[in-house]
């Protein structure tokens, strides 16, 4: 599982948070994400399911987990480069939770893979 973000060359890419070969139960913390624009007041999250073993990949729209409206909004403009904290947990049932925090605002997003309800 990954989420979209801008790389150091200002290109929107997918940054993988959970890799295919990770253990089933996962807890990871990331502090290398930041706001992209000067005066930003929120961050939108687009999640992707893929089998790549690369940390960063090009966006493939067919892999986006559609129908989501995930964001955190802190309501006041912040400088470009303001840190975002991302925490990812996957439990033994396979449920993935992403926690995000910036400027005191927090969000929790549950990712369910398409087709999991038929397993």
Residue locations for each model-derived region?
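Acidic low-complexity intrinsically disordered segments
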Residues: 1-119
